[in-house]
């Protein structure tokens, strides 16, 4: 009974989550005040970074004890120099789960005109910033590509011990990759999936 009692104690305060998550990230989808409109602000990752040259939102890895909101605002300030006081977060879009064990929490926020004017990108992280009108995404469908995730087991998997044949029909997976072209920029992948989800709400 001691083992069961210990298990009960552990579950008294347990909050269910998604099994297999190893890393959590948060990004801010920033809508900025520009001449009476509210286009979406994007950044291009600096040279030398992983995935350099890709279009993305400000954001990054959630630190221990940090909420998605705290992470998104911190990263936005670090990457773009926008003070947290100039960002009003008004919602959170559906989180994205990656096949390699990560969760991405996208938050939607409005950046004031003062915050937009204060932008000073970190040269170590951001090559450039640009905006895209919301109506572009509302009126333009992305190109959509799909790639397959095929299971590949090691040759020493114990098929006989678990009672299955070697041609067992393991489940694979599919990943949707939307791609938008805007002027000289390509918005694709995870960032495009976030945008697509927001536009479909």
What does each of the following model-derived ranges do?
Residues 1-56, 61-118, 135, 147, ...:
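N-terminal leader/linker segments that precede catalytic domains of diphosphate-processing enzymes
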Residues 122-124:
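Phosphate/pyrophosphate-binding betaalpha-module
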Residues 126-131:
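Flexible glycine-rich active-site/ligand-binding loops centered on an Asp-His dyad
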Residues 132-138:
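An acidic-aromatic pocket/loop used at catalytic or ligand-binding sites
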Residues 142:
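Active-site phosphate/ATP/adenylate-binding loop shared across adenylate-forming ligases
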